[in-house]
Amino acid sequence: MKHIPLTTLCVAISAVLLTACGGSGGSNPPAPTPIPNASGSGNTGNTGNAGGTDNTANAGNTGGASSGTGSANTPEPKYQDVPTDKNEKEQVSPIQEPAMGYGMALSKINLHNRQDTPLDEKNIITLDGKKQVAEGKKSPLPFSLDVENKLLDGYIAKMDKADKNAIRRRIESENKAKPLSEAELAEKIKEAVRKSYEFQQVMTSLENKIFHSNDGTTKATTRDLQYVDYGYYLANDANYLTVKTDKPKLWNSGPVGGVFYNGSTTAKELPTQDAVKYKGHWDFMTDVANKGNRFSEVKGTRQAGWWYGASSKDEYNRLLTDEKNKPDGYNGEYGHSSEFTVNFKEKKLTGGLFSNLQDSHKQKVTKTKRYDIDANIHGNRFRGSAIASDKEKDSETKHPFTSDAKDRLEGGFYGPKGEELAGKFLTDDNKLFGVFGAKQESKADKTEAILDAYALGAFNKNDANTFTPFTKKQLDNFGNAKKLVLGSTVINLVSTDATKNEFTEDKPKSATNKAGETLMVNDKVSVKTYGYGRNFEYLKFGELSVGGSHSVFLQGERTATTGDKAVPTEGKAKYLGNWVGYITGTGTGKSFNEAQDIADFDIDFKNKTVNGKLTTKGRTDPVFNITGEISGNGWTGKASTAKADAGGYNIDSNGTNKSIVIRDADVTGGFYGPNATEMGGSFTHNTNDSKASVVFGTKRQEEVKP
């Protein structure tokens, strides 16, 4: 990846950016151990200096070497980070890499040469995540824009030449001052045709030729999931969607579209029970081979599986799909159903994918298993296999469900508490691509936080709006603090020995992916993480910018509440680290872009209390005092500027007496990694007089004995 230095954040006079990087001695970052206590404020000790550049490893504490806790001669305690287990993840094959979703376009045979065309893993499309839309509206499905574009291409190919030339001349005339290239001209012609009344009429006529698995017309095609879209999206129009060219020699016929799953809101909490039931549906598409009437049991038309891939829709003529056709007293499933049992204690997922076959004469419904699902849970994702239930040789001419997908299945839990799941698989012989989705049958009794991932808006420039200033926005994450997930854009946050680690992702060349889906991130992404000698393994935090929209962010893997590496329930601990924030006040402001500032916390696990302060280099009084109460593997509390009752925090030490007052901002925090060796949190504040977005991260300390 090409690394480009981040542009220094330009802050208006009304803003304060506090980049807190604890553990530094003056302007030079110290060795990570040992580190003096950042508080250092004794009752009778000397105030001392704020940590000069030659005071190695003294992070600007309020007392010098003689500032003890009760006597000027009491040496100040020194600390070092408690060793942290390496956060090493299992290597994952490309077919099982996590994503917000995946899809594959319906396969076609070239009718000129009629060569068998197996499915190809390389043609699986990484999707960007289900789009959140206004209440009462539907999220656009993957392949819907792709279908429109293919229809548009077919329409333009059949347009009268004189009509196309007229559009061309008009666009050229409108751009005389700055002539367009042929590529630019072609794109403008395409968009002009797209907006034309004539093409919109064609689009309207296509509505009754579009089929998707959540159209709500039958029980089989009603998928009432909130966080996941999945299934097929297909359109069939012989007039405009049949492609025939001489260069290259190509002839495709049949529907266009694809099969997919697409999720939003990756789970941050999961149930703790050993048997949570999920139910839903599944869908599939097959390869193509030069053989008519290929699957006798799956044949919407004889071309399915021959000219184009057969899909789950092609088996509907043999299934119970509609409630009006159910036998008397029937209370079973419809269409292609899926069922899963999840043991969250043992981190196992098992299930089955079924075809609910209906005898057209007796009306009897037979629930026929097509695949057994077996997977292991990793964070909020699962990986495993789909094993075909019917591998008999003579079944290959009846249906395509005869081959396994061993270690070629992946999926994840969606919804804040894992209310839904979805996944995909590709069989070993590249014959069938399947997707599935399901939701909990009943609400789980108890859940536990497994991770945090969020951004706190700071400020926006140039009409950018990815983040709302001083508002928390949940980010997606696949259970790995070292990977920042922004739709289909994933950035590896690999630590180095550098004081700051910077990462960038350039603006994508296209605003859409191969499924025609609009990308969530259409601008340059810039990330800074902070450590200053501390190698955070399970917690990452810092600055995150998408174009001109700026934020601070935090993500971490929560400590378990049970087991030998759980959050302690006895004893006390010191935590030291860093913080980064953005603060504004009425008529005052100051930029601290390169400040080396300290987050200092005392945790009492037995009494479940949190006491901390966020300090800035060269100042004796804290910027924020924080108190909180522990619950499970997290905590909540309040943050206030020091001396709030006396007029607030004097932001300018030069004597201008301009202050910011923040009282009782709500703080949320968590413990991360084995045995709670890392801890972090955040808060926002938004009033007319003062605003703040702050994140902090710390590591547990052990005292260094003389």
Swiss-Prot record:
UniProt key word Oxidoreductase: no
The protein's matches in SUPFAM superfamilies, at most eight in alphabetical order, are given as:
OMPA-like (SSF56925)
- Kindly give the membrane topology term recorded for this protein: Lipid-anchor
What are the GO cellular component annotations? cell outer membrane; cell surface
Q: Where is the composition biased (Basic and acidic residues)?
A: 389-410
Subcellular localization, as worded in the UniProt entry: Cell outer membrane; Cell surface
Q: Membrane among the record's keywords?
A: yes
Name of the molecule in the record? Transferrin-binding protein B
